[in-house]
Amino acid sequence: MSDLDEEYQLDYFHEEGFERKECPSCGAHFWTRDSERDICGEPPCADYDFIGDPGFDTEYSLEEMREAFLSFFEDHDHERIEPYPVAANRWRDDVLLTQASIYDFQPLVTSGETPPPANPLTISQPCIRMQDIDNVGKTGRHTMAFEMMAHHAFNAREDIDDPDQYAYEGEVYWKSETVAYCDQLLDELGADIEDVTYIEDPWVGGGNAGPAIEVIYRGLELATLVFMCMEQDPDGDYELKDGNRYSYMDTYVVDTGYGLERWTWMSQGTPTVYEAVYPEMISFLKDNAGLDYSDREESLVNRAARLSGKLDIDDVDDVEAARDDIADELGVETDELRALVEPLEDIYAIADHCRTLAYMLGDGIVPSNVGTGYLARMVLRRTKRLADGVGVDAPLDELVDMQAERLDYENRDTVRDIVRTEVEKYRETLERGRRHVERLAEEYAQKGDPIPLDEVIELYDSRGIQPETVEEIAADHGADVEIPDDFYSLVAERHGEADADADDGTLAGDDDRIADLPETEKLYYEEPERTDFEAVVLDVIERDADGETVYDVALDQTMFYPEGGGQPADTGTLSTDDVAAEVTDVQETNGVVLHRTDEAPGKGEFVRGQIDGVRRRRLMQHHTATHIVGHAARQVLGDHVRQAGAQKGVESARFDIRHYERISREEVKRIERVANNIVTDNLPVKQEWPKRNEAEADYGFDIYQGGIPPGETLRLIQVGEDVQACAGTHVLQTGDIGTIKILSTERVQDGVERLVFAAGDAAIEATQRTEDALYDTAEVLDVSPQEVPATAERFFEEWKDRGKRIEELKEQLAEARAHGGDGGEEVDLGGTTAVVQRVDGDMDDLRATANALVEDGTVAVLGSGDDSATFVVAVPDNVDINAGAVVGELADRVGGGGGGPPDFAQGGGPDVDSLDEALDAAPEILRSMLEA
C-alpha cells in the first residue's frame, strides 16, 4: 500500500457499504458501491455514457446549476461568498491567473496567517487554466474558462502548543463529511449513486500535499476533493508521487472543486460540454461557418463524441494515433472522421476562447507582451486564427461580446475596443513577420532539416507568428516543421508564472544584529508634515561603501521615511551635541529602519532628527498626486486601467498604466482636468488600518494597485473615491498639492502607457520651463509665441518641398550618370552589359544610380571615395552574378568587407587611395564569375 492508503479508509465509505478496488486498466484504486464493477470509470478506461441519456433527473442551465450547488451548501451551514477576479495577480504576487477556488485563499488563509472570509464557505469561482488550451474542443469536456463550484473548510489541530498563532482553531469538518456532502448532492440531483466511483489520487502542488479523491460518474470527472494537510519536508515520513517527502501541518484545509460546466453537461447529455454551456453561440458559429451535416454525418459525429475523452493530450502520447483508434472503433476512415469533427472542434474552441477573453478583458487585463497581457494576446490571436481557418467571418469583437453579455460585464464597449485594436495589431504582425519565416524556411530547407520547435516558439514569442502559419509557409518553401499537440500549453507554461520577488534593496540584508533589534516606531504616519524629532540610538553598524566608511543607524523611532513603494527616502541630519551626521539614504529591513550616515552617533545617545522639509513636502505632493492621476485616468480611459509601476521624485513623478492604445492629447487634457478638480475640491486625505479581509470586502482588490503588502492589517489611503493600500507619506488635504501638470506621455512597452507629471511648485517650475522654450523659439523665428505653431508648420512644409526637389534633382543626376553622362566604363559581359563607375556622393546617390542602371538591364558596379571607399553592386534578375560576392572582393582590396543578397550588396573599407585600382579590377571579377 502507498504511504497515504490509510487516509482513504473513511468512516463514510465503510458505513455506506463501499468496496475498495483496483482498476485493471490503469491501476488506480477506487471506491464503489457496485460490487460487480471492475474499472474505475474514467476515460480512457471508460467512455462517456450519459450522452443522449442525461445523468440527472432535471436539465439545468449554467445559472440554475450554480444556484442549486450554492443553495445546497447554504442549507448545510456554509456561507456563500462572492467570486474573486480571474486575474489572481490583483491580490497575489506569485501567480497570474486564478486556476482554482483555493487560489482565493492562498497563501495567507491556508497558512493560518489571516482568517477566511467565512468558515465554512461556498463559492463559484471563475477560473482560467491555460494548460488546457490544446485539449479544448477535442476531448468534449475541457474548457479553458470554467467556474469551479467549491466548498472549503479551514481547520487547525487542537493538540498544537500555541493555537493562537493561527487565525482559526479547531476542526470544522474533514474527509468523511466532505465525501458525504458530495454523495448527498449527487443523490438529490437524481444521480444513480451506484454508478459513482471515488478514485484515490494523492495531490501535490506548491509545496503542499494531501490525499485527494476524484469523483467519477458515467465516464465524467465531476469533482475533485482535496484534503490539504501536508507540507514539503526533507525529513518527512511520507514520500509522494513527485518524489519529495512530506509531513503533516498544524492546519488542514478542505479544498474541493466541482466543475459547473461538467455538472450542467451531465444534466443535459449533449454530445459535448460546449453545446450545454454555449448553445446559442455554437449554433451561431456553425451557421456562420456553413457547417451542415446529414443525418448520417450527425450520427457519426455524436458517436465520436462519446469516445472523444480518449483524445486528452495529457493521457495519450499521440493524439492522431488515438483518433485512428476511434475511427477504427466507429468503422470509418480516419480522413472522413477528421473532415467531420475537426471543423466542429475549432467551433467549440472559438466559443470557449471567446468566453476566456470575456473573463480576461472584462476583469481588466490589457493584452501586451508580458504577464497576463501576454496570455490574453495568445488566446485572442489563436481564436482569430481558428475563426479564419474554419470560415467564421463574424468580427471577433462581436463574438467576444456575446460571451461578455452573458457574463454581465458592464465594460463591454471597452472589451470590444480592445479586441478590435488587437485584431488590427495581429494583422500587421503577420504582414511584418511573413518574410522572416520565409527566410527561416529557406535556410532549413537548404540544410534538409526541419525547423526546430525552439525556433517555432521563438517566432511566436518574439513576432507573434502562430505555428500553423509557420507550418504553411514552411511547406511552400520545402521545409518541414513538427508542431506538438500541446504547443500552446508549452507556450502558456513559459509565461504562466509571476516574476520572482525582486531584491528588497535593504542596506543590511540578513545582518544578525538587525534581526535582534525591535521594530522602529514610525512617526511619519501620524504627523507627516512634521520634520523634526528626537530618538534613542539602538545600534550603529559600520560599513564600507566604495572605499568610504559609512554607518547604518537604527533608532527607537523615526520621522525619516525609508525608500519604498516608488517613493525615495527622506534625507536630512541626525545630531547630538558632538556629531552632526548627514542622512543620505534610509531603508527598512524586517521592520527596522536604517539611516545611512557619514558620521556615527554613539549607541544609547539621544539624537535630534531633522528632515529636509522641502524634499519631504514635494515627495508627499507627488505621492498623493499619483493616486489622484491614477483615479483620473480610470475615469477618462476606463476601469481596465491599472497601475503598472510608479516612481515619485522631487521634480516630477511618473505613473505607468495598462492601456491598450496610445493616450491622445485630448485624453491627457481630460485627465488633467479631472485630477485638478480633485485638488481644488480640497478633499481630506484619510488613512485607516483595517484587517485585510475587511479591506477587501469593503473596497475590492483594486486597493492593491501599488502592490500587495504583507500582513493581516493594511494601511489604506482614501482620496475621494480612490482607496489604495499604501505605505507612503501624503498631504493632509488635496488642496495642499496646489496643482497637477501632466508633462508628457509615452509608450514604454506594448500595453503600458507612462504619464509624467509634476505637482505643486514643481508643476509651476515645469510649466515655466516649457514657456521659456516657447518664448526662445518665438524669438528665433521672430514671431509672437501665439504664432509659433503656424510658423513652424509653414517652415516644415517648405523644408519638405525642398527635400522633394533635392531628391528629384538627385534622380535626374543618377539618370544622367547611368546613361553615360558621367564617364562610366561599359563592360561587355557577353549577353549583358556592366557599368563600372566612380560616383563621389553619399550612399543614397550610389543606390539611386545603381537602381537606374538595373532598371535598364545593366549590371552596376559603383564606387565612391568621399570619406572612405564605398561600393554598391546591383545585378538584374536574369544575370548569373552574385552581387554580394563582387562587393566582398572589391571591399577586400580597400581593407574592408561587405556583402548582401545576390541582387544588391554594399560594402567598403578605409583605403580610399585603392578605390580606383579596385574599380579597375571589377571587369575581370565579373567575367570570372560568369565563367565559373
UniProtKB/Swiss-Prot annotation:
Q: Which cofactor does it need?
A: Zn(2+)
> Any notes on this protein's domains?
Consists of three domains; the N-terminal catalytic domain, the editing domain and the C-terminal C-Ala domain. The editing domain removes incorrectly charged amino acids, while the C-Ala domain, along with tRNA(Ala), serves as a bridge to cooperatively bring together the editing and aminoacylation centers thus stimulating deacylation of misacylated tRNAs.
Q: Which domain of life is it from?
A: Archaea
User: What organism, scientifically named, is this protein from?
Assistant: Natronomonas pharaonis (strain ATCC 35678 / DSM 2160 / CIP 103997 / JCM 8858 / NBRC 14720 / NCIMB 2260 / Gabara) (Halobacterium pharaonis)
Q: What is the protein's name according to its record?
A: Alanine--tRNA ligase
The cross-references to Gene3D superfamilies, in alphabetical order and at most eight, read: 2.40.30.130, 3.10.310.40, 3.30.54.20, 6.10.250.550, Bira Bifunctional Protein, Domain 2, Threonyl-trna Synthetase, Chain A, domain 2
Q: Which PROSITE patterns match?
A: AA_TRNA_LIGASE_II_ALA
Q: Would you kindly state one Gene Ontology biological process term found in this protein's UniProt entry?
A: alanyl-tRNA aminoacylation
Query: Which residues of the sequence carry a binding annotation for Zn(2+)?
Result: H623, H627, C726, H730
What's the Enzyme Commission number for this chain? Answer: 6.1.1.7
Entry keyword set: Aminoacyl-tRNA synthetase, ATP-binding, Cytoplasm, Ligase, Metal-binding, Nucleotide-binding, Protein biosynthesis, RNA-binding, tRNA-binding, Zinc
- Give the source lineage, highest ranks first: Archaea, Methanobacteriati, Methanobacteriota, Stenosarchaea group, Halobacteria
Instruction: Name where it's found.
Output: Cytoplasm
